[in-house]
Amino acid sequence: MAASAAAASAAAASAASGSPGPGEGSAGGEKRSTAPSAAASASASAAASSPAGGGAEALELLEHCGVCRERLRPEREPRLLPCLHSACSACLGPAAPAAANSSGDGGAAGDGTVVDCPVCKQQCFSKDIVENYFMRDSGSKAATDAQDANQCCTSCEDNAPATSYCVECSEPLCETCVEAHQRVKYTKDHTVRSTGPAKSRDGERTVYCNVHKHEPLVLFCESCDTLTCRDCQLNAHKDHQYQFLEDAVRNQRKLLASLVKRLGDKHATLQKSTKEVRSSIRQVSDVQKRVQVDVKMAILQIMKELNKRGRVLVNDAQKVTEGQQERLERQHWTMTKIQKHQEHILRFASWALESDNNTALLLSKKLIYFQLHRALKMIVDPVEPHGEMKFQWDLNAWTKSAEAFGKIVAERPGTNSTGPAPMAPPRAPGPLSKQGSGSSQPMEVQEGYGFGSGDDPYSSAEPHVSGVKRSRSGEGEVSGLMRKVPRVSLERLDLDLTADSQPPVFKVFPGSTTEDYNLIVIERGAAAAATGQPGTAPAGTPGAPPLAGMAIVKEEETEAAIGAPPTATEGPETKPVLMALAEGPGAEGPRLASPSGSTSSGLEVVAPEGTSAPGGGPGTLDDSATICRVCQKPGDLVMCNQCEFCFHLDCHLPALQDVPGEEWSCSLCHVLPDLKEEDGSLSLDGADSTGVVAKLSPANQRKCERVLLALFCHEPCRPLHQLATDSTFSLDQPGGTLDLTLIRARLQEKLSPPYSSPQEFAQDVGRMFKQFNKLTEDKADVQSIIGLQRFFETRMNEAFGDTKFSAVLVEPPPMSLPGAGLSSQELSGGPGDGP
């Protein structure tokens, strides 16, 4: 029995000293020498996989109390919670347990009091709170030296002060024991320091057994999963499986490093998914804002009685994307919370692996394992792709009636509707018939929100409903709200509706899946009458209302456009498309024309094939409805309510400061006031009653602008817009080039002196005609000059009454203008600088 105990003691001493046991030899030494490098590699791998966003603050949190933010020191009795956050014992309050038994052989286990973590608010039992051994050696060096000075020899029972320290045995020795240590054959080769702290080879402070006060914890009992001393292993842990400290540390570090690497890879995926969700939320918000602007541009064109009904429909349409946005918000919130938790676990585990405190690592491995396994079991749903949403509208889509304005119909392709069939005659889907297949789910009528039909003869063609519902595959009842659509402000609508016109209808065509975006269609209530379906009257027949266009709010995938014309998308990224669809004869629509090019809001304006407009042939649009009448360029245009000419704000004379109202008329159509009523004492030559020459009176200014605008819009005058070939004008020289751009600049007082009389204005125009006549030798051009002079005289006579301007249409002597030398772009306010 004694021999067996001696053998066990020798084996324990061998483990503590680090010398190779029987049969190990140099190979065992090599194995131990590679263990630190393997642990360092695993630690480096964990550090590489740890999040970079932690920074110094996250690492500082590991060494500071989560409550008082003070640095954790041994005298503050740091405690480690199961969530791997640390706090002072005093900050945790009475629920904090006393220091647990290091060897696991005794000590109070604590009660079942529930404690809230001061950092992450997770609840845990007080018995699960352990001492933070990583912070055990964080005290000042002075305190450490003072403690080492009081260390007694552990090899004898004399309690003599220790003067030396054996590195292999990790024991403080007195002078007598040092001599005995060097005489024994087994220990004579040990490294003995004359003085120094009681630390092991790795530089960490030795932890002593609570039962055997002088015995260090040098063994790891696998059966009890705890550190033991040699005496405890021979007594309380007899016949248990155990490992030497170095072997246990090496094995546990490998396991922890593997778990940290796995969690690091999963955390990287979570970070990517979180960024994608955040990006998706921003994109959904941006799409909503963009579509909201597009819808406002269309809503401003329709009639004022649509205001009341339109608000209800827009509020219903907002539910189209609401579900997806709320789901993404919840998913992002959950992912962010899990991400922060995993970041802390990774930081703590990496910090523990990088630490050289093997004892603390083994004592805390349960908590670390638990959190790593728990984090690995968390399942994060993948980010679902979202589609592209567009807004398309037809300029001539709006109707005259706001009573029973329409409805929202939800259709899901590939699903069969189990609800009652809508009480309406057969309708053709129109231009959007290929945008989705499947049945239409009628809306459920809700009390207080029905669309009353009144006396409208065509109102019975559509069910009057407002509830936004949709059916799911395999379900017989309607459930779920449509996802959110952009909000549209209708306060600026000022429209005139008549009771004998058919209201438009709102329809929602959902995507192919539950997550796809939906399609909202605004069409005339009687549009089915012109589609040529059996049972309906074709367009143009008696009793059939005219076919109207459609305004479409469109949400679709980027590369799978639903029903968009070939010109509506270019490249992989689609733009919002403003479609100008044709309307039947007699239909009236809004007057804001933006037919081609790009508008200020980024809308791409296209004209689908086969469409026509008043004044144009089949498949084409009239030039007056596509480009500016003055500069012949597209862009943001305003349309005259009478002549239907389109102008840029700067091209019109006088220049427009803001977008005019619906009933706006250009200067060519505007009725000018009587000269005598406005001018008073001013005569046609611009002189007042005192004889002092002044600039044009307001009435004469308006008349000259009207005549000049007529010249700009007159097609034969197109070559006269800018005759100057140089970059600057040179009117101060005889024969200087003169064109409509310069005349416009002087009329708008961009050149001085401005015109003081209509006669002076007429002289400049006549001089321009003569200069152009000198530049050409073609007889046709000469005849056109004569025709232009007659056109100008006619316009002047119409504006100024019976006054004859033939006498002043002669070339006056050259005049030097202070504005000479200005570039044409500085002088031109319209033809050359349209939007």
Curated annotation (Swiss-Prot):
N6-acetyllysine PTM positions: 266, 304, 340, 377, 770, 774, 779
Instruction: According to the UniProt record, list the residues that bear Citrulline.
Output: 470, 472
A Gene Ontology MF term for this entry?
DNA binding
Which InterPro entries is this protein grouped with? Bbox_C (IPR003649), Bromodomain (IPR001487), Bromodomain-like_sf (IPR036427), KAP1 (IPR037373), TIF1b_Bbox1_Znf (IPR047059), TIF1b_Bbox2_Znf (IPR047058), TIF1beta_RING-HC (IPR042713), Zinc_finger_PHD-type_CS (IPR019786)
One GO CC term, this protein = protein-containing complex
Outcome of substituting residue 366 to G? Greatly reduced interaction with PPP1CA
The listed outcome for residue 554 to R is:
Moderately reduces sumoylation and repression. Abolishes both sumoylation and repression. Relieves the repressor activity on Dox-induced GADD45A transcription and 2-fold increase in phosphorylation at Ser-824
Q: In which tissues is it expressed?
A: Expressed in all tissues tested including spleen, thymus, prostate, testis, ovary, small intestine, colon and peripheral blood leukocytes.
Q: Where is this region: Leucine zipper alpha helical coiled-coil region?
A: 246-376
Domain comment from the record reads as follows: The HP1 box is both necessary and sufficient for HP1 binding. The PHD-type zinc finger enhances CEBPB transcriptional activity. The PHD-type zinc finger, the HP1 box and the bromo domain, function together to assemble the machinery required for repression of KRAB domain-containing proteins. Acts as an intramolecular SUMO E3 ligase for autosumoylation of bromodomain.
Question: What is the designated name of this protein?
Answer: Transcription intermediary factor 1-beta
Organism expressing this protein natively:
Homo sapiens
